[in-house]
């Protein structure tokens, strides 16, 4: 039996205060069904970060996985771009 394709999202880390867990906000754009205006949507996901390598502001890629806790269903795949510290 074949496994379903796992969802992969790219987003920005908004919190890294938890141990081995990051909060990632994923922003998407959709057209309004009647008026056609582009609308921004955002959703927060908790993701597993085994090495605590991602920091707040980083752009990361996360992948769907088995449930790891009450809220965690994603894991960190890679850090696409590190945050610039000013």
From Swiss-Prot:
The protein's UniProt keywords, in alphabetical order, are: Ribonucleoprotein, Ribosomal protein, RNA-binding, rRNA-binding
InterPro entries from the entry?
NA-bd_OB-fold, Ribosomal_uS17, Ribosomal_uS17_bact/chlr, Ribosomal_uS17_CS
Task: Summarize the subunit comment.
Answer: Part of the 30S ribosomal subunit.
Q: PANTHER family attached here?
A: 40S RIBOSOMAL PROTEIN S11 FAMILY MEMBER (PTHR10744), SMALL RIBOSOMAL SUBUNIT PROTEIN US17M (PTHR10744:SF1)
Pfam families cross-referenced by the UniProt entry: Ribosomal_S17
One cellular-component annotation, GO: cytosolic small ribosomal subunit
Organism of origin: Lactococcus lactis subsp. cremoris (strain SK11)
Identification of the protein by name: Small ribosomal subunit protein uS17
The UniProt function text for this chain reads: One of the primary rRNA binding proteins, it binds specifically to the 5'-end of 16S ribosomal RNA.
**GO terms for molecular function, please?**
rRNA binding; structural constituent of ribosome
Q: Which NCBIfam families does this one have? A: PRK05610.1, uS17_bact
Which Gene3D superfamilies does the record match to this protein?
A: Nucleic acid-binding proteins
Specify the superkingdom. Bacteria
User: Which protein family is named in the record?
Assistant: Belongs to the universal ribosomal protein uS17 family.
One GO term (biological process):
translation
């Amino acid at each position: 039996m074949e496994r379903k394709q796992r969802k992969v999202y790219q987003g920005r880390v908004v919190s890294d205060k938890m141990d081995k867990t990051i909060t990632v906000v994923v922003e998407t754009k959709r057209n309004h069904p009647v008026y056609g205006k582009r609308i921004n949507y955002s959703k927060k996901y908790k993701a597993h970060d085994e090495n605590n390598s991602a920091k707040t502001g980083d752009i990361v890629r996360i992948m769907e996985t088995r449930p790891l806790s009450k809220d965690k269903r994603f894991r960190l795949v890679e850090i696409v771009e590190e945050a610039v510290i000013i």
